[in-house]
Amino acid sequence: MRLRNKPWAKDKIAAYPQYVIPDPETKRGRWRELFGHDQPLHVEIGTGKGKFITEMAKLHPDVNFIGIELYPSVLVSALDKLIESGLANVKLLNANAKDLTAFFADGEVSRIYLNFSDPWPKKRHEKRRLTYRDFLALYDRILAEDGDIHLKTDNQSFFEYSLVSLSQYGFVLASVQLDLHQSGMTDNVMTEYEEKFSAKGNRIYRCEAVRPPRRSS
């Protein structure tokens, strides 16, 4: 993905600390206090321009949402949507997924969304894939006992890799859809990428994976 540089993006993000949390480490274990509601916490990793997370937040006011995006030039579009909507149950982080355990306490998150993650197709880049075992270990820590991962992609190879990686780690595949838009699922919220790829006729793959039983220390 080629990113359009927006030199002003960081300054705009910094101007809205009520939406893009500047010090997420200080909220670890206390996100429900920040939101002001004791509701389930759902996290989207790679929130992009924010269409998915803002629409989900509108549909589910009884859930608190956090969108994580590494690139300021992309996150600023999600910020614009959040400012316009005025949603109180969404916060954003300009952060790296490698730092998840610094932001969230063990068992604090109920669900993780991985929507159209970079597939990093070259073998030498395997460790960068968001379903590589090192990332799964982070998800395992922050997810609640009955927490789960919802994944969508149009990349068949990445999907197959993810199914194997999740299974080998111990996640239970509760749902696997090889053609989401022909599956009859009625409550699917599409991302920007999903709209683009499905319009081209690309098949969309989806799975739900439940975290393994908590390992005893």
Curated annotation (Swiss-Prot):
InterPro entries per record: SAM-dependent_MTases_sf, tRNA_(Gua-N-7)_MeTrfase_Trmb, tRNA_methyltr_TrmB_bact
A Gene Ontology molecular function term of the record: tRNA (guanine(46)-N7)-methyltransferase activity
Binding site for S-adenosyl-L-methionine: 44, 69, 96, 118
Sites where the protein binds substrate: 122, 154, 191-194
Active site: 118
Pfam families hit by this protein: Methyltransf_4
Catalytic activity: guanosine(46) in tRNA + S-adenosyl-L-methionine = N(7)-methylguanosine(46) in tRNA + S-adenosyl-L-homocysteine
Gene Ontology CC: tRNA methyltransferase complex
E.C. numbers: 2.1.1.33
Interaction with RNA: annotated span: 124-129
Alphabetical keyword list: Methyltransferase, S-adenosyl-L-methionine, Transferase, tRNA processing
Domain of life assignment: Bacteria
Disulfide bridge partners, by residue number: none
Pathway: tRNA modification; N(7)-methylguanine-tRNA biosynthesis
Gene3D superfamilies reported in the protein's UniProt record: Vaccinia Virus protein VP39 (3.40.50.150)
Family the entry assigns: Belongs to the class I-like SAM-binding methyltransferase superfamily. TrmB family.
HAMAP family: tRNA_methyltr_TrmB
Role noted for this protein: Catalyzes the formation of N(7)-methylguanine at position 46 (m7G46) in tRNA.
NCBIfam families in alphabetical order: PRK00121.2-2, tRNA (guanosine(46)-N7)-methyltransferase TrmB
Protein's UniProt name: tRNA (guanine-N(7)-)-methyltransferase
Organism in which the protein naturally occurs: Geobacillus kaustophilus (strain HTA426)
Encoding gene per record: trmB
